From Swiss-Prot:
Every EF-hand domain range: 481-516
Notes on how activity is controlled: The very low intrinsic ATPase activity is increased upon interaction with liposomes.
EH domain sequence ranges: 449-537
Superkingdom to which the source organism belongs: Eukaryota
Effect on the protein upon substituting K120N: Complete loss of localization to CAV1 positive caveolae
UniProt KW keywords: ATP-binding, Calcium, Cell membrane, Cytoplasm, Endosome, Hydrolase, Membrane, Metal-binding, Nucleotide-binding, Phosphoprotein
G2 motif as annotated region, ranges: 91-92
InterPro entries in the cross-refs: DUF5600, Dynamin_N, EF-hand-dom_pair, EF_Hand_1_Ca_BS, EF_hand_dom, EH_dom, EHD_N, G_DYNAMIN_dom
Organism expressing this protein natively: Homo sapiens (Human)
Protein name per its UniProtKB record: EH domain-containing protein 2
Cellular localization per UniProt: Cell membrane; Membrane, Caveola; Endosome membrane; Cytoplasm, Cytosol
Keyword NADP applies: no
Transmembrane segments: none
Biased composition (Basic residues): 534-543
Length: 543
């Protein structure tokens, strides 16, 4: 099931089919959709024109939620690394949009510099103004997870009108801009503080039309007991039903997404299964990137077609000389009737039309005499794209599915969940770490506590001097650390990759667990000072 976690091929490279589909979509957009957008000023009413970076960029995940629901902690949990410039706390700590992306060195890039970078897909954020750009930044860091995806952290959503006004920019509009371009939207809720404020309701409304991308996470679920959790889950589903305008039920993942011990471990097994489901969704993003781009382009093309019919109809109804302003007001007032007339005349689905009230507001600021009449050739090219050109790309997409078995999100928490005895299915898989050789004479830092760990080791009844994965797992789970963390510890400790722990490897695992419980991080690769003395020659020869 997790075959894409196996390493192979150059990391970060896209399969040929993905590049082929992406380049074909860019060509179709430039030749058949963009001319129609420019002719009918689509960007002035909806989203601005797409650029190459919008097609070539990595899949993006948008993380949104009210303040102190654990958004930044969730991202750091996925990366198993702190994000430069981020703060974590019970108060509203993230006050800006942060694009967490891969970079060779750690650092931050301010928003004004970010929107002029042609290699980044953020150039079209410039119209939101300087107030927003001062609240937008990019955090770059070398992390394996970010080689496959980028993550957008958002400001904590507040309650009360004063906080909404004080932002100084159109927060829902910015969310809508990101929602159109990201591959996945994760809405975080706090199980211990469940509420949906007015601004959060408005923010969820801004995501309308992108419900297929939304995943809901009920975070901090380890803070409540089983019976309370069931009630919180029911209350969340009821609240979501009031603010999400679809009859379908959103997928809700329950868990505690941080690397600290579970406060109430009763539902540990549930949290493990939910985490694996969520991780599978995220891991599949690179494999389905081309399909998502195609889907979004078709969705955009259908909206552009409707927009062209609306604008050309308004142009046709305008008088040539007198009474232009009065006629404009009448047409805007009658816009719902015009929508219905266009729908019947051109056999268009009601779901393809924009929001009528918002369209009326936008039309007030435009001069109808500058609109263009219907241009059949442009619409014929668009129809050809939707009916023939897109259909020709489907075999390439199926080929991409076959070629992308080794492409997926790796590293961070995604790797730790599937290590050693923490693998849900199949035997342990040996994986190369690529550590540098160790010094045989270096002192082992675990030695001073080994007698304490040996007592625990022999109480667990090892067979032939080694603990099986199942026995070791039983003891390790008792520490209440998440499975993803314990999986990383197992990977670091099972130095000889035999799927078992001897006394030295068990002592190393215990040492790493204690370090984690004290708040320290885990190394990406095992430093030479931590390699057990008896394994140093074995490790060096294996490499």
């Amino acid at each position: 099931m997790f075959s894409w976690l196996k390493r192979g091929g150059a990391r970060g490279q896209q399969p040929e089919a993905i590049r082929t589909v992406t380049s074909a979509l860019k060509e179709l957009y430039r030749t058949k959709l963009l001319p129609l957008e420019e002719h009918y000023r689509f960007g002035a009413f909806h989203s601005p024109a797409l650029e190459d970076a919008d097609f070539d960029g990595k899949p993006m995940v948008l993380v949104a939620g009210q303040y102190s629901t654990g958004k930044t902690s969730f991202i750091q949990y996925l990366l198993e690394q702190e994000v430069p410039g981020s703060r974590v706390g019970p108060e509203p700590t993230t006050d800006c949009f942060v694009a967490v992306m891969h970079g060779d060195t750690e650092g931050t890039v301010p928003g004004n510099a970010l929107v002029v970078d042609p290699d980044k897909p953020f150039r079209k954020l410039n119209p939101f103004g300087n107030t927003f750009l001062n609240r937008f930044m990019c955090a770059q860091l070398p992390n394996q997870v970010l080689e496959s995806i980028s993550i957008i952290d958002t400001p904590g959503i507040l309650s009360g009108a004063k906080q909404r006004v004080s932002r100084g920019y159109d927060f829902p509009a910015v969310l809508r801009w990101f929602a159109e371009r990201v591959d996945l939207i994760i809405l975080l809720f706090d199980a211990h503080k469940l509420e949906i404020s007015d601004e959060f309701s408005e923010a969820i409304g801004a995501l309308r039309g992108h419900e297929d991308k939304i995943r809901v996470v009920l975070n901090k679920a380890d803070m409540v007991e089983t019976q309370q959790l069931m009630r919180v889950y029911g209350a969340l589903m009821w609240a979501l039903g009031k603010v999400v305008g679809t009859p379908e039920v959103l997928r809700v993942y329950i868990g505690s997404f941080w690397s600290q011990p579970l406060l109430v471990p009763d539902n540990r097994r549930l949290f493990e299964l939910e985490e694996q489901d969520l991780f599978r969704d995220i891991q599949g993003l690179p494999r389905h990137a081309a399909l998502r781009k195609l889907n979004d382009l078709v969705k955009r093309a259908r909206l552009v077609r409707v927009h062209a019919y609306i604008i050309s109809y308004l142009k046709k109804e305008m008088p040539s000389v007198f009474g232009k302003e009065n006629k404009k007001k009448q047409l805007i007032l009658k816009l719902p009737v015009i929508f219905a007339k266009i729908q019947l005349e051109h056999h268009i689905s009601p779901g393809d039309f924009p929001d009528c009230q918002k369209m009326q507001e936008l039309l007030m600021a435009h001069d109808f005499t500058k609109f263009h009449s219907l241009k059949p050739k442009l619409l014929e090219a668009l129809d050809e794209m939707l009916t023939h050109d897109i259909a020709k790309l489907m075999p390439l997409l199926r080929q991409e599915e076959l070629e992308s078995t080794e492409v997926g999100v790796q590293g961070g928490a995604f790797e730790g969940t599937h290590m050693g005895p923490f693998v849900e299915r199949g035997p342990d898989e040996a994986m190369e770490d690529g550590e540098e050789g160790s010094d045989d004479e270096a002192e082992w830092v675990v030695t001073k506590d080994k007698s304490k760990y040996d007592e625990i080791f022999y109480n667990l009844a090892p067979a032939d001097g080694k603990l099986s994965g199942s026995k070791a797992k039983t003891w390790m789970v008792g520490t209440k650390l998440p499975n993803s963390v314990l999986g990383r510890i197992w990977k670091l400790s099972d130095v000889d990759r035999d799927g078992m722990l001897d006394d030295e490897e068990f002592a190393l695992a215990s040492h790493l667990i204690e370090a984690k419980l004290e708040g320290h991080g885990l190394p990406a690769n095992l430093p030479r000072r931590l390699v057990p003395p008896s394994k140093r020659r074995h490790k060096g020869s294996a490499e």
